[in-house]
Structures are given as C-alpha cells and as structure tokens.
A protein has these predicted regions:
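Short helix-boundary/capping micro-motifs
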Residues: 17-35
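A short LG(V/I)-centered, amphipathic sequence patch enriched
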Residues: 45-64
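Alpha-helical linker/hinge and terminal dimerization helices associated
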Residues: 49-50, 71-92
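Interdomain hinge and pocket-entrance segments immediately C-terminal to HTH DNA-binding domains
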Residues: 60, 66, 89-107, 121-126, ...
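Central regulatory/effector-binding core of bacterial HTH transcription factors
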Residues: 95-158
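Hydrophobic hinge/microswitch elements
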Residues: 133-138, 142-146, 152, 201-257
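Secondary-structure junction motif
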Residues: 183, 193-215, 277-281
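A late-sequence structural motif
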Residues: 256-289
Length: 289
C-alpha cells in the first residue's frame, strides 16, 4: 500500500510564512522567538515533505521559488481558517488578531476615534491596519490575507455574494479646485486640465474619471500616493482633484481651495461570507455607534 504524504503542519506553515515575509532566517527566528537552527530545520523538513524547494538561498537572503509563492497563498488561507476556528470555539468578548484593511482616506479621517475606542474597550484585540485602494483590499480579503476591509464599491457594481457588508460611513465627494476658481457647472469649466488621482483600483479615482468623461478635452492624470499630496498639488494651482469632505475637513489646505459637491458614496465594512471571529465583532460595534 502506497504511503500517504505527510499532512501539512500549521506550525511549519507559520514558520514558512514568516521567513517569506522577512526574507531571512535570522529575522524570522527573532520574530518567532525561536533559534535559527530550528527555523532552518522546519523549513527544510517542509521542503522535504512537499518534494520541492520553497526558497532560493542567496547568501543570507531567502527568496520564494515559484512553488513557494503558490504555497504562500495556501498558507495564508489555512492559517486564517485555523485562527477563525480557534476563535469560534472560544466565545467571549472581542479578542484575537484582526487584520483590517482600509482606504487611505478612511484611515486618515474616519478611523482615529473608533480605533481609540476599540483599543480602550477591547485591549485583547490585536489590530493590524493596512491601507490600499479598494480593488487591492478586496483581492487581499478574498485571498484570506485580510479579515475585513473598509471599501467603497464603484456605483452600479453588483453585490458580491461571496462577501458580507455593513454600511458604516457616508462620504460626500467634492471637486476641489485652486483658490479663486469660478463655479464649475460641469467638467468643461474646470481649469487647469490636469486631474490628481490615486492609483488604479481606487473607487474615487473611477468616479472622478467618469465625472470628467464628457469633457471635450480629456483631463491629463497626475498619479499621487496620498491625499495630502493631492490637496497640496491642487492648492499649488497645478491641478484639480476629487476627495471626500471628511478628508478636506482635516487638511491644512482646506482654506486654499474652492470646492463643488459631486456625489455621495457609502463606505462598507466588508468580510467574507460566513466568516466569524470574536475580533471582528469589535469594529462592527465601534464603527456603527
């Protein structure tokens, strides 16, 4: 009778994932509070069990092989499911690890007060906050790399049956223009002809581009990495932008800008269908209070 292959060990997968994240056995051992020889042995045993190298070893640097990259996706999901099972069997107040993703605008303008309440009320919740564009956050949520995300769905996009959502904020989006810019009744009245935007995958960028789509002379795009940079560029007179009012209200550039309301959009707390954890209860409570 053919011998069955060894079962994947969760502890070994956690070590593998940490080495992949750190790119070094030394740093992974420090992070895991293990001796280096133990980390090396567990990685080599995992490679032997799977019959394939998982890392390319370049001196002290460890880089994933193509097979290692495939395993990393499964490791993220298996470890997330194991943590979900552990929390489901230990009911009680919100506690445990929570990997929360958020749009940059929401993290800056909406989350400081709720997260302060979360830390005060439930110190047992270990929060890890990541910011990115909506499309990236949803991809990471589906891949089990995040537990929940705060995102804005593009208008007209149908609901995803694989995800659950909870409306938490309503954002008013504003067209912001250099100080003294006359009232813009439509996209053709906007000058200069450059639009400051976030990276592709940002819902607000998509809304901005759709609003300017009827313009006879297409807008040039200036891709920037933060709302501070977008607002500073608009204040400098070089471009227009579309930002949430909540972001503009905390910006030192607010008094230097003209503004026009464009539309409203809902920010949704989103998680995988059927996912339950004690830690997820915390943001669900503080964000709707």
């Amino acid at each position: 009778m053919e011998k069955a292959p060894p079962l994947l060990d969760l502890a070994a997968l956690d070590i593998f994932r940490t080495v992949a994240a750190e790119g070094s056995v030394t740093r992974a051992a420090e992070r895991l509070s293990r001796v280096q020889s133990n980390v090396t042995t567990r990685v080599r045993q995992l490679e032997a069990d799977l019959g394939t190298p998982l890392f390319l070893r370049e001196g002290k640097r460890m880089a994933l092989t193509p097979e290692g990259k495939v395993l990393l996706g499964y490791a993220d999901r298996l470890l997330a499911l194991a943590e979900e099972a552990r929390q489901a069997l230990q009911p009680g107040p919100p506690a445990g690890r929570l990997r929360l993703g958020s749009m940059e605008s929401t993290a800056a303008s909406r989350l400081p007060a709720p997260l302060a309440r979360l830390h005060s009320q439930w110190p047992g919740v270990a929060l890890e906050l990541t910011t990115a564009a909506t499309r990236v956050l949803v991809e990471r949520l589906r891949a089990h790399a995040l537990d929940a995300v705060l995102v804005a769905w593009p208008p007209g996009q149908p609901a995803d049956p694989a995800l659950e959502t909870l409306p938490v904020f309503t954002e008013e989006l504003l067209l912001v223009l250099p100080a003294g810019h006359p009232h813009a009744a439509g996209p053709d009245q906007v000058q200069p002809g450059t639009l400051a935007v976030f990276e592709p995958g940002c819902t607000y960028r998509r809304i901005a581009q759709e609003w300017f789509a009827p313009r006879r002379q297409p807008m040039q795009l200036l891709e920037l990495g933060s709302y501070h940079a977008i607002l500073a560029s608009v204040a400098g007179g070089g471009c227009a932008g579309i930002v949430p009012r909540s972001v503009l209200s905390i910006s030192p550039h607010a008094a230097l800008l003209s503004q026009e309301p464009i539309t409203t959009i809902t920010t949704l707390l989103t998680w995988r269908q059927g996912y339950r954890s004690a830690a997820l209860d915390a943001p669900q409570q503080v964000l709707v209070d």
